[in-house]
Amino acid sequence: MAETVFDKIIRGEIPCHKLYEDEQVLAFLDVAPLSFGHALVIPKERAKTLDLLSDDSAAAIGRVLPRLCRALKHITGVSAFNVLQNNESLAHQAVFHVHFHIIPKPDEKSGLGVAWPAGKLDAGQGAELAARIVKELAA
């Protein structure tokens, strides 16, 4: 995996507005925020995409993410927020180190804007897909 700006932030070579840090996780304010309070939560483990992250680091992120969401809601006074995580360029990942965005949504125009055409899941396709995924998880 190529070095990223996040590796340099983790090592302290690039400064950040740190919100939280432990042995496995670092959280800091985004320098190009979509809204006031936009934060990033990253594992210290180097992994390009979420599927490559260890279960241990994923669990550490899972313990920290809700706490940071609560703190951001309280401090910004915003009740609505998005948690966003992208994997690979096609899915809009720009920094190739797993990271989660917490983006406060104070109004319709600020924060993350999301619109997509909802599809319809065919019952037969859904049953077949679910069975295949369950089998893969058991492997």
Cite the ranges covered by each PLM segment.
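HIT superfamily nucleotide-processing domains
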Residues: 1-139
